[in-house]
Amino acid sequence: MSLQQLTHDEIDHLSMIELGVKILKEENKAMNYKVIFNKIAELKDFTDEQKQNMMAQFYTDMNVDGRFLTLGSGMWGLKRWYPVEQAEEEITEEPKKKTKKKKKKAEVIDDVDDDLDVTDDEIDDIVSDLGDDLDDDDFEDDLDEDLEDLEDEVDELEADEDVEDENDDDNTR
């Protein structure tokens, strides 16, 4: 039965979902959600306030009802019109390739590599600069002082042993 053949009482007794199914069957093509809802609101003589209150409910009902299929961009059709393979193709978006980001990362790495290129001559210059900063004489002086300190300690220990030996000799006599 066509929508135009329905009486006002019959329309009032039909749910918005049933009217949505009838509208899509009559048009025989996918339609925008708002267009479907506006036709329902016109058939049911909704006021502007009723339209605002019922719009979200109708959208929820379409999502929950198993007879509808969203095709993206606000377009809805009847699920039975579309084979499973076709519906999945229309719904599924192709993932975007992220090659641009990878190229940017590669460029950054190349820049870092350029900064890290150091020649052997540059390394030799750095090492010789470090060597100039160290005063070899100071190092040798420090070693000499350490050696003298050790010799002094040894002399003191030997002197202490000599004193002990003398004391032992005195006690044994």
UniProtKB/Swiss-Prot annotation:
Gene3D superfamilies, alphabetically? RNA polymerase, subunit delta, N-terminal domain
Molecular function, one GO term: DNA-directed RNA polymerase activity
Under PROSITE patterns, the record lists: HTH_HARE
Ranges that cross the membrane: none
Q: Which stretches does UniProt call biased (Acidic residues)? A: 109-173
Q: What does this protein do?
A: Participates in both the initiation and recycling phases of transcription. In the presence of the delta subunit, RNAP displays an increased specificity of transcription, a decreased affinity for nucleic acids, and an increased efficiency of RNA synthesis because of enhanced recycling.
Protein family according to the UniProt entry: Belongs to the RpoE family.
User: What is the protein name given in its UniProt record?
Assistant: Probable DNA-directed RNA polymerase subunit delta
Species assigned in the record: Oceanobacillus iheyensis (strain DSM 14371 / CIP 107618 / JCM 11309 / KCTC 3954 / HTE831)
Q: Please state the gene responsible for encoding this protein.
A: rpoE
